[in-house]
A protein has these predicted regions:
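Stable alpha-helical elements in mature extracytoplasmic
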Residues: 8-15, 50, 71-75, 79, ...
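Flexible, polar/acidic helix-loop-strand segments at domain edges
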Residues: 11-94, 173
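Second-shell loop/turn segments in exported
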Residues: 1-3, 38-40, 58-67, 80-88, ...
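C-terminal solvent-exposed extensions
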Residues: 45, 106-176
């Protein structure tokens, strides 16, 4: 890893605002949290709804983290598509987002490096995200004495996904 750029979950609303909202199809029942977010409807999320959509787990659908992660993937895919579209319309658009989040992000990269990286990303193709297979169980791994739903990834699945991503073969590097 040559650098990192992080944005806390609490800043999703601000990111959403900077891009003018992100369109998603509501995947879970949000009726206990926000009755305007109706299951199956396609909406452009308000800033507060964007945070709710990617953050909330309890009182939403089956309350499973896997469901929340699916919503996060959908949000990221739609965000990527929107940013890519807006960047094609206005080449400096990505810099507007960067400047808007500068005080909220944590990074070890300089502006020039981020600019090069975002330029490459904006011209790229969204290849999706991997969900690793595993088992859902209930446990007390957080140490708070409360049963929580936990997800444990199969070791073989970890190897399989890393092999797919990096083109690894036993005993060989990708370019050998």
């Amino acid at each position: 890893i040559n650098g990192y750029y992080t944005l806390s979950m609490e800043k999703i609303a601000k990111l959403n605002h900077l891009v003018g909202g992100v369109e998603v199809t509501i995947q879970d029942d949000f009726s206990k949290v926000d009755d305007t977010m109706k299951l199956g409807s396609t909406i452009v999320l308000t800033d507060e709804q964007a945070y709710t959509y990617v953050h909330d787990r309890y009182n939403v659908g089956d309350e499973a983290n896997l469901s929340r992660m699916a919503r996060q993937r959908e949000y990221m895919k739609s965000l990527f598509t929107k940013v890519q579209q807006k960047t094609k319309e206005k080449s400096g658009y990505i810099n507007t987002i960067y400047k808007g989040l500068k005080q909220d992000a944590t990074t070890d990269m300089k502006g020039k490096t981020i600019s090069k990286l975002t330029n490459r990303i904006s011209k790229g193709t969204y290849l999706g995200m991997h969900t690793l297979e595993g088992q859902v169980s209930t446990g007390k791994a957080l140490g708070d004495g409360i049963d929580h739903v936990e997800y444990r990834v199969n070791d073989q699945e970890k190897i399989s996904v890393l092999t797919e991503i990096y083109g690894l073969q036993e005993g060989k590097e990708k370019d050998e």
